[in-house]
Swiss-Prot record:
Residues 315-390 are annotated as: Disordered. NCBIfam families: ftsZ. Keywords: Cell cycle, Cell division, Cytoplasm, GTP-binding, Nucleotide-binding, Septation. It comes from Staphylococcus aureus. The gene is ftsZ. This is Cell division protein FtsZ.
Amino acid sequence: MLEFEQGFNHLATLKVIGVGGGGNNAVNRMIDHGMNNVEFIAINTDGQALNLSKAESKIQIGEKLTRGLGAGANPEIGKKAAEESREQIEDAIQGADMVFVTSGMGGGTGTGAAPVVAKIAKEMGALTVGVVTRPFSFEGRKRQTQAAAGVEAMKAAVDTLIVIPNDRLLDIVDKSTPMMEAFKEADNVLRQGVQGISDLIAVSGEVNLDFADVKTIMSNQGSALMGIGVSSGENRAVEAAKKAISSPLLETSIVGAQGVLMNITGGESLSLFEAQEAADIVQDAADEDVNMIFGTVINPELQDEIVVTVIATGFDDKPTSHGRKSGSTGFGTSVNTSSNATSKDESFTSNSSNAQATDSVSERTHTTKEDDIPSFIRNREERRSRRTRR
């Protein structure tokens, strides 16, 4: 029997913690963009760098160990600094239902302290999601090795982990794109992930999703993919769904996902057929036995636009490969899906990129002439063929 909850639901408390220089920078850019219903926390061993943070809560960790002078690119010092300041970290996390821990892997503070912070958050009962970057190849083997160890430590500490190799930034931006603008693309994975989840649990829908649904999909699931796609006009539902599951910045593909939370937001013209079209695209790209939780929201302000939000987990954790100049930006497409407006002017990819959005899905799994056919279409045809044979 289906049961429907009525009445007021307490909104989940979301906190974003930036650890180290890279994490602090990501938090600053999120704050500059403007986000509601989220608390920001900056953690660093470097007191001078911490003073530049725009977060409302700042924690200088390891004051006795480092005297505020940083971790010297030594992850062990970063780890010990976080352990020294455990009580301060616990106080900052207190009351959070969901915690995003973001950092750049390869240095000292982020690599060493972020797993400690994430472990504390999870031990305190918060749904804990890590969003980390791997260093560029040109940063050297030592930094790459430290980053790999940091990623493994994060995997052990969080519920789900999203990894962004910085080298992928070279695949999605033009040669003339300024460095800081390129880094914003990586930050979009975090920003739009937080925004998407915040909107899912804050906005009531015709078919409603809540924080319990988010926990079902993301608790203890390893790697994760989060995507947002927006489209309008003809085939808008299909195009939005394709964009949402195509993330060339991420190490994880939706192919084989065993858990998917999907939400479709549209104007009053959103039809049941369009909802089915979008759901079919996502379901056919995932595992055959996927556990899919589906919701819809009607927002008259969107008019002709449809926004598809996808959270996918339950993978085999095999890194994916991507071709250059693949479709959309890191978190599906660069859109703000708040209930007030949808912004489409943040993408740094070319105008033709949307037409290529599904290529990255097929590139991850096939190297034959069938590469021109998106894998979710092949999967759908194979399933239909099996049903016919039965």
